[in-house]
Amino acid sequence: MKNAYYIGLMSGTSMDGVDAVLVDFSGAQPQLIASHTEAIPSHLLKGLQRLCSPSTDEINRLGRLDRNVGELFALAVNNLLTKCAIAKEEVIAIGSHGQTVRHMPNLEVGFTLQIGDPNTIATETGIDVIADFRRKDIALGGQGAPLVPAFHQQTFAEVGKKRIILNIGGIANITYLPGNSDQVLGFDTGPGNTLVDAWIQQVKSEPFDRDGAWAASGKTDQDLLTQLLSHPYFSLAYPKSTGRELFNQAWLEQQLSPFNHLDEEDIQSTLLDLTCHSIARDMIKLSNEGELYVCGGGAFNGQLMQRLAALLPGYTLNTTSALGVDPKWAEGIAFAWLAMRNHLGLPANLPAVTGASREAVLGGRFSAK
């Protein structure tokens, strides 16, 4: 059977690098051929972080960063192909998520904005690019997120098995696969790694809390946890999605101001519990028991996994590697899949998940010619 190669590009709210994956979709299940992470240079990272907070001269900065991120994504593709020695002519298309700089679907005129110019990626790689996956769903009245549940359904659903796929990046999202004819559901539960990363970066200048070791050295403050969990987002009904617009460093500092007597490691422990409790609450609303499979950066945080297991005694807990998909690359593979769906003219959103009025083919194609 002829190979069906697609490349997926993903940079999430954590902004911890650009993940590039080469995937073969010619078989029954996606096959990961090669993977590569391109580090985000510090000057570009600072520019992106500034752009995520409203300020002046935004349009000029947006235009520059759009090109810069496109160049970085193209570099990730070219390095990926060098690594696996596959010619660009063999790749059908690149699916690029881009870098989200605003996600505000709940305004009167909702919108989402990802940058990373697909024209730049196409011209610098010589491969057609499919990008701008979220805005069609928003145009149809949806949240534009999460988009991965359709991929999870096709890849992980099994009749008779009640499964939840939990993706923990900067933001955490879940996909509920009921194992029967009931609707697949999915939504963002709230912060994933974004607040624990922000706190350790602020206090220790470390990029992330490796294996949750710093959180494990602290003790959760129940009063602070209760206050954090009182954020209105946690009581919203789905479909719902969120991002740095709600859960960011400024919000965190505001929440911490009455708690400046707490030790720094106790705050870290509490922030990790915020992630775990908000996930567990939403999961228990869907079902008290089932199979839980975790992907994304959070899957490699032993302390996070341990706390989740304690909060969810009715669930068996594993990573998506048990289902044949490496948890580190799952989201990149999903965007390669979204590119394939666009190329084949097939819908890729789930209206029950996003709230869109109908299914739709997502993304636009940007030719390399």
Swiss-Prot record:
Which reaction is recorded as catalysed by this protein?
Answer: 1,6-anhydro-N-acetyl-beta-muramate + ATP + H2O = N-acetyl-D-muramate 6-phosphate + ADP + H(+)
Keyword Hydrolase present in the record's keywords: the answer is no
**Domain of life where this protein originates:** Bacteria
| GO BP field | 1,6-anhydro-N-acetyl-beta-muramic acid catabolic process; amino sugar metabolic process; peptidoglycan turnover
* Cross-referenced Gene3D superfamilies: 3.30.420.40
- Enzyme class, spelled out: transferase
Q: What is its EC number?
A: 2.7.1.170
Q: What is this protein called?
A: Anhydro-N-acetylmuramic acid kinase
- Protein's organism: Shewanella baltica (strain OS223)
The gene behind this protein is: anmK
